[in-house]
From Swiss-Prot:
Organism: Francisella philomiragia subsp. philomiragia (strain ATCC 25017 / CCUG 19701 / FSC 153 / O#319-036)
Family annotation (CDD domains): RNAP_beta'_C, RNAP_beta'_N
Protein name: DNA-directed RNA polymerase subunit beta'
A Gene Ontology molecular function term of the record: magnesium ion binding
Listed PANTHER family: DNA-DIRECTED RNA POLYMERASE (PTHR19376), DNA-DIRECTED RNA POLYMERASE SUBUNIT BETA (PTHR19376:SF54)
SMART domains for the chain: RPOLA_N
Length: 1416
């Protein structure tokens, strides 16, 4: 008996896949334990369930354990007996959570999901519009199901009158009916095979794309039904399953009333209507009444399944829509997200956090009361083992009375038992870390100050939760993987996240500053102890400059050791810190003024050279010192610390005078409104900066007497020190405190032109205060929106990347991405060394002389990237997650180094989730606004030349030049760049050169710092001719396509091309400048864009390099740039921008002006033989950047606009696309000063490229133009290659993260993300199988996730499975009695034991490796 139970429970957990499909009536009946016939629930007097009702004990099982309803059979001994009086089986009461019932519907009912979830599956299957299907279903029209010999058509709709007429004319030769029966008959009658064949023929023959698309959609649906084993008529239900009663409870509340689940109401409506319909049919009621009742039954079932999907939602007594079955599973409060993906856990507590400055990094302070509650079971068992209590009850009593011995035992229990601390919101994995608890009095949890940055915690009332890992394994994982001391580096950037902030920084800054003429200056000390004694006795000042003899051992990153010896100039404070500095680090790290950045460097260096353990100790010591000396320094802020500059009033008056002058100019109509506004904003910006500068001058210098003369030294002003050290505050805030507040922004981002001239020390007037509130309120509103948006972005990212895990060491590819330094505005923002660190080389690194420096497959560490730098390598090929060939995962080599652990990434690391967290976590720091360029935001001066900042050589890239009559070299190419390399050949600068720029030097020439390498007109883009000849103007007609103006002063005529939208007639005219030779043959034609101002007239003579026309740049620059969070979301969602740039689909020559239509212009691209290879239609308002007859390559820009990532991938290839996303996303984060490693963005990009489009199906089952998972195509190609058949050809398709998440192979993961109804409908028709590969699916069904230690466990269990199969052992043999084992089983048991030992050894080994790498 017992084994049966075990077996039953064991099996319920053991499955490999989950399949979802349509349920047939037979299947529904097989689930059921009886039919629910009555709408009654329970008897309100006896509280017993009614028989055959919704809570019937006979159908669903007993209410009390092992007790039938009437009480005849009680106790376990009667288990399994069915009571003959009440018909209830004697069982556990929990079967009421599992047993289902059913309702036999009198007439069929359509399942609303397959009707209304778009696209309507029933409509598509029957090839009928949804409206028509609804008319039939809700009894408005008849539908012909069998036309017989009549001229009626199958599926033709008939109104009542038409039906009556047809009956009169044809009698009963045809069949027509209405309601779900009709639909069911039509579905059942469809012959799938013949229908599929006719559709395939239609698809082949059809010429129109719309028809083809419709045919292919229908074809796919029919093929799905054919393949999945689902019958189409199952979309119409004849039997309705009833949920087990304990999942829709009815609970008595005081006052004799009941609280009930909405589902019971919905079921009661269905049963009532079903029973009424049965009665009406028995009575042979009139057709119209029956019809109405059938319609109501359909509506009742609709409401039960998905309330509100059709028509108005059914409401309860309180006017609230009832919660249907569909509502139970979808949304944040649904089953998936509320109960399966996020559960509440036992053994946890929460409390306010407070600062624990005396803790060590791996400790936290846990209030005694809390600890006792959390560790109760451990305390109970220790009390029994120690002999203090004989029973658990006694132990419990002792704990409740809080006897003295309990506290002693609690100390023992919590010793070295780590607890997890978590602060919500947990934006990245460092939001949960493990600490060793220390018992403290009070009720607040004490947190170590250095981990605040990781938790983003402060002590203004934040709360944190504590969780206790119970099992030994979980304690081990907490200690090895989650301990705060093992999480020194941030997984997002690889930089230390444990760096001192605020008070600590201030203290260290204060004691490392020097003061002229301080007490004890110039003394020489022989060691640290002498300095310490002298300082403690008060003979020397902490800021005094002294000399100190040192003798230390120093290690470098390459592992070499050298001695640091001799006398150094230092200060007393720095000498005192020498005691903290561990052996191996140079004193020069400390021997300077320690601002925040420098302290970070020390910790970084310590980690690189000495490893984790020493770094943790150093960080703690730095913290103690920082706190100690910031206390001793007595730094505080007073009103007098804010020094207002003396020249402030004069500056403000001067600005007001200038503004008055500008206003007068505006009133005399000499300048425009826009110029007036911009000038005023400029003046106030400048004034504000000048006042700020004078304030900084005043506040940053002090005058002291040294040897009787005045000397200027750096100030010890408190506010200045706080800002300078990086502890708190910034220059901007100081300016507002003591300078002037300056310009304020309106909520839309534009500046208010009346600046605030007061500062906070003087105080603001009412008007100025009001002006300030504008921006401040916007800030608060923004923050609230931003948090939600950033959270949603993180959720989408996690969802798309959750199943990406490192599953093998090496995929063996030699593909990769080309990496070079990132250059913005000509400056190197991110050097190659930083980008290459921690990546694997995909190709050998070779010098110009052909020497192989580093071989492919090398993992670049700090020492190896220096080799790149030393040899002036400016481009390398590295392996990338995007190009990794591993299927359903990644390989360790393509991913490279694990940023948080500084070694190669482990197999089993869930890199997808880490990537998503790294990108999403800083989301709240990004701005929400779009930047308005033009106006106040772009106060930068317009750039019109390029001066080099590095001495070296210049090199042209994609630059074509012509020499004009003045001997100048004019650039005539569009996307040209000049690269500046230093003397070593390393790329130091990279500048984009606009068309029309003059370049004085040739490629390959040497340059010095400050040399000008290009100049151009910043206000206009010139159109330049590269041929000489005579001008013929075509379609340049005054008043129609152009505007001719004469300047009376100079007598010159200007011709400006007007916009098409301003023309009333002649919309097909295209203004062109043609250059002809002496015989009048055309050599070149230059099309003129809107706004172009001509420099030539008819019959002008042109030389090579002359300017034909200029396009003013004002109009094109004043666009909004989407910045911050919306930009990142836009990139990852792969949205197509409005008016995107048009790229050339192939190589060839451009031909314009041929067969243009009224509204559109046509670009034709001719191949080498002169045939049209591709043609593109564009609105005439779009500005083309190519000329007639120009040669273009695939992917060249034809019409400018923002980049469309889809086109970039299609025409320029994977690498160009990857580059674009990386650079764009990184520039947003860089603006906010956030460092994220490239590989995280690449990891997400990989997930956006999971699908591919079939170009040629080969010998596969796929259909051309179908979009399919890349993995499936590759697997199919492997199969075809084995059989020697034609392979599938495909191209990668780009999908945004939301679409990518919804189209994953796992329907569980997709359904728990968004659009649950749609996903489940789709999956059930396909009879989809979920292989449970990802993390989310396994969390949903409550298993270990297949990553980290879970992956090891899964691999081992798969091994055991395999052995089971080989030995032919069934599962239940494990549960048979030992005596009945045969030899084979015993052999198997031994094998299992050995395997178990192996598993333990494996896990032990992986943990040992982890421990070793962590330096314990």
């Amino acid at each position: 008996m017992n084994n049966g139970i075990l077996h039953q429970n064991y099996n319920s957990k053991k499955f490999d896949i989950i399949k979802i499909s349509l349920a047939s009536p037979e299947v529904i009946r097989s689930w059921s334990h009886g039919e629910v016939k009555k709408p009654e629930t329970i008897n309100y007097r006896t509280f017993k369930p009614e028989r055959d009702g919704l809570f019937c004990a006979k159908i669903f099982g007993p209410i009390k354990d092992y007790e039938c309803l009437c009480g005849k059979y009680k106790r376990l001994k009667h288990r399994g007996v069915v009571c003959e009086r009440c018909g209830v089986e004697v069982e556990q009461a929990k079967v009421r959570r599992e047993r289902m019932g059913h309702i036999d519907l009198v007439c069929p009912v359509v399942h609303i999901w397959y009707l209304k979830s778009l696209p309507s599956r029933i409509g598509l299957f029957l090839d009928m519009p949804l409206k028509n299907v609804e008319k039939v279903l809700y009894f408005e029209s008849y539908i012909v199901t069998d036309p017989g010999m009549t001229p009626l058509e199958k599926k033709q709709l008939l109104t009542d009158d038409e039906y009556a007429e047809a009956l009169e004319n044809y009698g009963y030769e045809f069949e027509a009916s209405m309601g779900a029966e009709a639909i069911r008959d039509l579905l059942a009658d469809t012959d799938l095979e013949t229908e599929i064949e006719s559709l395939q023929a239609e698809y082949e023959e059809s010429k129109s794309t719309a028809k083809k698309e419709k045919a292919i959609k229908r074809l796919r649906l029919l093929e799905t039904f054919q393949a999945s084993g689902n019958k189409p008529e199952w979309m119409v239900m004849t039997v309705l399953p009833v949920l087990p009663p304990d999942l829709r409870p009815l609970v008595p509340i005081e006052g004799g009333r009941f609280a009930t689940s909405d589902l019971n109401d919905l079921y009661r409506r269905v049963i009532n209507r079903n029973n009424r319909l049965k009665k009406l049919l028995d009575l042979n009621a009139p057709d119209i009444i029956v019809r109405n009742e059938k319609r109501m039954l359909q509506e009742a079932v609709d409401a039960l399944l998905d309330n509100g999907r059709r028509g108005r939602a059914v409401t309860g007594s309180n006017k609230r829509p009832l919660k249907s079955l569909a509502d139970m599973i979808k949304g944040k409060q649904g089953r998936f997200r509320q109960n399966l993906l996020g559960k509440r856990v036992d053994y946890s507590g929460r409390s306010v956090i407070t600062v624990g400055p005396s803790l060590r990094l791996h400790e936290c302070g846990l209030p005694k009361k809390m600890a006792l509650e959390l560790f109760k079971p451990f305390v109970y068992s220790k009390l029994r083992l120690g002999g203090y209590a004989t029973t658990i009850k006694q132990a419990k009593r002792m704990v409740e009375l809080e006897e003295a011995v309990v506290w002693d035992i609690l100390e023992v229990v919590i010793n070295e038992h780590p607890v997890l601390l978590n602060r919500a919101p947990t934006l990245h994995r460092l939001g949960i870390q493990a600490f060793e608890p220390k018992l403290i009095e009070g009720k607040a949890i004490q947190l170590h100050p250095l981990v605040c940055a990781a938790f983003n915690a402060d002590f203004d009332g934040d709360q944190m939760a504590v969780h206790v890992p119970l099992t030994v394994e979980s304690q081990l994982e907490a200690r090895v993987l989650m301990m705060s001391t093992n999480n020194i580096l941030s997984p997002a950037s690889g930089q230390p996240i444990i760096t001192p902030t605020q008070d600590i920084v201030l203290g260290l800054y204060y004691i490392t500053r020097e003061k002229e003429g301080a007490r004890g200056e110039g003394k020489l000390f022989s060691n640290y102890d002498d300095v310490s004694r002298a300082y403690n006795s008060g003979t020397i000042d902490i800021h005094a400059k002294i000399k100190l003899r040192i003798d230390r051992q120093v290690f470098d990153t390459k592992g070499n050791t050298y001695n640091e010896k001799g006398v150094v100039n230092t200060t007393v404070g720095r000498a005192l810190l020498l005691n903290i500095l561990p052996e191996g680090l140079s004193f020069s790290l400390l021997n300077k003024v320690l601002v925040k950045k420098e302290i970070s460097k020390i910790i970084n260096q310590a980690f690189r050279v000495l490893g984790g353990k020493a770094t943790v100790v150093l960080a703690d010591k730095l913290m103690y010192a920082g706190f100690k000396y910031s206390t001793l320094s007595g730094v505080s802020v007073g009103v007098d610390d804010m020094t207002i500059p003396e020249n402030k009033e004069a500056k403000v008056e001067e600005a007001e005078k200038e503004i008055k002058h500008i206003t007068e100019q505006y009133q005399s109509s000499l300048i425009t409104e826009n110029e007036r506004y911009n000038n005023i904003i400029n003046i106030w910006s400048k004034t504000s900066d000048e006042v700020g500068a004078s304030m900084m001058d005043a506040i940053s210098k002090d005058t002291v007497m040294v040897n009787g003369e005045n000397k200027e030294i750096e100030s010890f002003n408190s506010v200045y020190m706080m800002a300078k050290s990086g502890a708190r505050g910034s220059y901007n805030q100081m300016r507002q405190l003591a300078g002037m507040r300056g310009l304020m922004a309106k909520p839309d981002g534009t500046m208010i032109e009346t600046a605030i001239t007061a500062n906070f020390r003087e105080g603001l007037s009412v008007l100025q205060y009001f002006t300030s509130t504008h921006g401040a309120r916007k800030g608060l509103a923004d923050t609230a929106l931003k948090t939600a948006n950033a959270g949603y972005l993180t959720r989408r990212l996690v969802d798309v990347a959750q199943d990406l895990v490192v599953i093998e060491e090496d995929c063996g590819t030699d593909d990769g991405l080309m990496f070079s330094a990132i250059v913005e505005d000509g400056e190197v923002k991110v050097p190659l060394v930083e980008r290459a660190l921690g990546r694997t080389l995909a190709a050998d690194v070779v010098t110009e002389k052909g020497v192989v420096l580093l071989e492919a497959g090398t993992l670049l560490d700090e020492n190896l990237v220096e080799i790149l730098d030393d040899n002036g390598i400016d481009m390398i090929k590295v392996r990338s997650p995007i190009t990794c060939k591993t299927r359903r995962g990644l390989c360790a080599k393509c991913y490279g180094r694990d940023l948080a652990r500084e070694r190669k990434v482990n197999v089993g690391e869930s890199v997808g989730v880490i990537a998503a967290q790294s990108i999403g976590e800083p989301g709240t720091q990004l701005t929400m606004r779009t930047f308005h360029t033009g106006g106040a935001a772009s106060l930068g001066i317009t750039v019109s030349d390029i001066k080099v900042k590095t001495a070296g050589k210049i090199k042209f890239k994609n630059i074509r030049t012509v020499t004009n009559k003045d001997g100048q070299n004019i650039v005539i190419s569009r996307a040209g760049e000049i690269i500046v390399s230093d003397t070593m050949g390393r790329v130091r600068e990279q500048h984009k050169i606009p068309m029309g720029a003059v370049v004085p030097l040739a490629s390959g020439k040497g340059v010095e710092i400050g040399d000008v390498i290009a100049t151009w007109d910043p206000h206009a883009q010139p159109l330049i001719t590269d041929v000489a000849g005579k001008v013929v103007l075509e379609d340049v007609i005054d008043g129609i396509t152009s505007k001719h103006t004469y300047d009376d002063l100079t007598g010159q005529q200007t011709i400006e091309i007007t916009s098409i939208s301003q023309r009333t007639t002649s919309k097909n005219l295209k203004p062109v400048v043609k250059v002809v030779d002496e015989k009048g043959n055309e050599i070149k034609s230059i099309s003129l864009a809107v706004g172009a101002v001509l420099n030539v007239t008819d019959d002008s003579v042109l030389e090579v390099g002359d300017v034909v026309a200029k396009i003013p740049l004002e109009g094109s620059k004043n666009k909004d740039i989407t910045g911050g969070l919306p930009r990142v979301a836009e990139l990852f969602e792969a949205r197509r921008p409005k008016d995107a740039a048009i790229l050339s689909p192939c190589d060839g020559m451009v031909r314009l002006g041929n067969r243009d239509t009224k509204e559109k212009q046509r670009i034709e691209i001719l191949d080498k033989s002169g045939h049209i290879a591709e043609e593109i239609l564009l609105p005439k308002s779009r500005h083309l950047v190519v000329f007639d007859g120009e040669q273009v390559s695939k992917g060249d820009v034809l019409a400018d606009g923002p980049t469309d990532p889809h086109d970039l991938l299609k025409y320029k290839g994977l690498e160009a696309f990857a580059d674009y996303i990386l650079i764009e996303a990184q520039s947003v984060y860089r603006m906010q000063g956030v460092v994220i490693n490239d590989k995280h963005i690449e990891t997400i990009v990989r997930q956006m490229l999971r699908k591919a489009t079939i170009l040629d199906e080969g010998d596969s089952k796929f259909v051309k133009d179908e979009s399919i998972e890349l993995v499936r195509i590759l697997e199919e190609n492997d199969r075809l290659a084995k059989e020697g058949k034609r392979l599938v050809e495909y191209e990668l398709t780009l999908m945004g993260i939301t679409r990518s998440s919804l189209s994953t192979e796992s329907f569980l993961s997709a359904a728990s993300f968004q659009e649950t109804t749609r996903v489940l409908t789709e999956a059930s028709i396909h009879s989809q199988v979920d292989q449970l590969r990802g993390l989310k699916e396994n969390v949903l069904i409550g298993r270990l996730i297949p990553t980290g230690t879970g992956l090891a466990v899964r691999k081992e269990s798969n091994k055991i499975e395999k052995m089971r199969e080989e030995l032919g052992v069934e599962d239940n043999m494990i549960f048979t009695e030992a005596s009945s084992f045969n030899t084979e089983d015993t052999l198997f048991e031994n094998q299992i034991e050995k395997e178990d030992k192996d598993i333990n050894d494996d896990i032990e080994e992986s943990l040992r490796n982890a421990l070793e790498s962590l330096d314990f």
